[in-house]
């Protein structure tokens, strides 16, 4: 079943260092571009354990939840994140 998944990717490492634009772009090229035909990235401000941080929301429409989970796990690994939130929504119709 096709769904729209949104991954919430925080841009602050546990040591309070910021993930740079270059580092995030490398992740998109190495991971997102290889797993998905297309996706949308939005900027947001999130809150994790009482701390606000810059966040990227990656929206992807796919029937392969396992690929979304893989992308989230790789982000956690690459950037030493505690968690990546994923929301699941009904898919938008592509016309």
Language model segments and positions:
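Positively charged, small/polar-rich N-terminal and surface patches that mediate targeting and assembly
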Residues: 1-95
């Amino acid at each position: 079943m096709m769904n729209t998944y949104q991954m919430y990717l925080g841009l602050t490492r546990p040591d309070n260092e910021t993930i740079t634009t270059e580092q995030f772009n490398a992740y998109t090229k190495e991971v997102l571009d290889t797993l998905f035909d297309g996706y949308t990235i939005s900027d947001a401000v999130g809150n994790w354990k009482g701390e606000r941080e810059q966040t990227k929301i990656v929206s992807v429409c796919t029937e392969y939840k396992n690929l979304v989970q893989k992308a989230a796990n790789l982000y956690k690994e690459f950037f030493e994140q505690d968690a990546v939130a994923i929301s699941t929504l009904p898919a938008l119709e592509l016309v």
